[in-house]
């Protein structure tokens, strides 16, 4: 599923055709590649959060502090690999899994607990 976020004065998106992180500075008229690596896995969702971009991939949760140029692992546990969507819920992050479970994090995605 393609994901598009606003980050500063840019639009940033996942291009599902080639798994690239792309950006636009002209409201989406043209797009430039920002990240085309494969070490993070397949990107599923993006979230601007506390001055960073948090990404959910098939390898876990990653973050970027430089607009998506590079990515650092945040959590690569087996449960994080099933996340398909991430949401800012104020004092916590929420992540939905591919089997319908909901997880929450109170430490910017470092650890996750299943919501009962």
Language model features with spans:
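Entry beta-strands of beta-propeller and related beta-repeat scaffolds
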Residues: 4-13, 51-55, 90-95
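Short coil turn/linker residues within repeat-based beta-strand modules
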Residues: 18, 28-29, 68-69, 109
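Conserved Ser/Thr-centered positions that define the repeating blades of beta-propeller domains
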Residues: 24-25, 64-65, 105-106
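Surface loop/turn motifs at the tips and blade-to-blade linkers of beta-strand repeat domains
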Residues: 35-38, 75-78
């Amino acid at each position: 599923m393609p994901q598009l976020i606003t980050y500063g004065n840019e639009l940033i998106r996942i291009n599902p055709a080639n798994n690239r992180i792309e950006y636009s500075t002209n409201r989406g008229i043209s797009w430039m590649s920002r990240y085309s690596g494969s070490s993070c896995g397949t990107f599923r969702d993006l979230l601007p959060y506390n001055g960073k971009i948090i990404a959910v991939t098939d390898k876990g949760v990653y973050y970027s502090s430089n607009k998506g140029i590079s990515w650092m692992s945040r959590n690569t546990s087996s449960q994080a690999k099933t996340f398909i969507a991430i949401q800012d819920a104020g004092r916590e992050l929420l992540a939905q899994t591919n089997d319908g479970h909901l997880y929450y994090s109170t430490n910017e995605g470092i650890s996750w607990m299943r919501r009962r």
